[in-house]
């Protein structure tokens, strides 16, 4: 995608960059949580991944709606919008992969583990822990219009 953007001289608006940075930080945190939980066999940390994944999905949906607004107001072109949407879809896929890895971790040691996330009751969304983490991440990664967010595309090492 970055090559396509460079070759076609595609540029996002500052608002689009700000929004992408928020969801990108959430994805980075989810990847770091997933890696640390997996490397340390930390099932407690693994339970933080699903609520963060739901926040990422929600953010991506919200940002797609913001893109539609920019498109309808003439503040964004189709080419930029296609790349923007592709990036958001990639973030969603990363979140799903992290959740799948954590299902495998949380079910490891079970006598008959069913590793299919869609059948899994491993992430009860009605638990107090899930709601607590969800609320924490919702506040941390809230999209606020016209608020300055640091624009960073630098790679980050797993902590």
Residue map of PLM features:
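Cytosolic, long alpha-helical scaffolding segments
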Residues: 1-159
């Amino acid at each position: 995608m970055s090559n396509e953007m460079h070759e076609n001289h595609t540029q996002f608006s500052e608002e689009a960059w700000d929004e992408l940075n928020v969801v990108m930080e959430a994805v980075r945190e989810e990847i770091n949580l997933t890696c640390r939980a997996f490397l340390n066999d930390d099932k407690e940390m693994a339970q933080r991944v699903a609520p963060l994944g739901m926040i990422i999905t929600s953010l991506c949906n919200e940002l797609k709606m913001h893109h539609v607004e920019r498109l309808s107001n003439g503040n964004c072109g189709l080419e930029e919008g296609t790349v923007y949407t592709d990036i958001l879809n990639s973030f969603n896929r990363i979140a799903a992969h992290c959740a799948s890895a954590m299902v495998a971790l949380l079910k490891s040691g079970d006598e008959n583990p069913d590793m299919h996330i869609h059948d899994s009751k491993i992430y009860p969304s009605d638990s107090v822990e899930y709601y607590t983490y969800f609320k924490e991440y919702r506040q941390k990664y809230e999209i606020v219009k016209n608020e300055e967010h640091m624009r960073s595309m630098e790679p980050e090492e797993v902590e």
